Amino acid sequence: MGLKTAVKMTGIVKKFPGVVANDHVNLEIMAGEVHALLGENGAGKSTLSNILTGLYRQDAGTVELSGKKVEFNSPRDALNAGIGMVHQHFRLVSTFTVAENVVLGESDSSLFMDQKAVAARVQELSDRYGLAVDPSARI
C-alpha cells in the first residue's frame, strides 16, 4: 500500500502590498516523508510555512490534512490539528563555513574532523558540478 497524503496545499496565493509572496503554489507531503523548502531570500518559503501553521491566511487556494480541507484562523487552530513550527532565529547557531555546513548533519562529524580534508572535498564537488563555492566562506 502506498503512502497517504498528510499535507496538501493547492493553488496557494498570498499577496502583501506590492508583493506576491506565493503565486498558485502546490505542495504535497506524504505521510512519513520529510521535506525541505529551499529557495533564495524572498522566494515565499516562510510565507507558505506561515499559512500552514495558521500565522497567515491564504488569499486563495486550499489546505488539506489527511484528505480533509482545513482553514486555520490562528496558530492555535493549526496546533490543534497537529501542525506546529519551530521558528528559525539567526542567532540560535553561530555562523559556519560552507564546508562546516556541508558536514553538519554527518553522524561521524565532530569538532576534531580534518577541516582541510572537508574543505578540499567540498571544493572538489563544487568544481565537478560547476558551482562557484568557497568552502571557507562563512554563511
Describe each region flagged by the PLM:
Residues 1-139:
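Glycine-rich phosphate-binding loops of nucleotide-dependent enzymes
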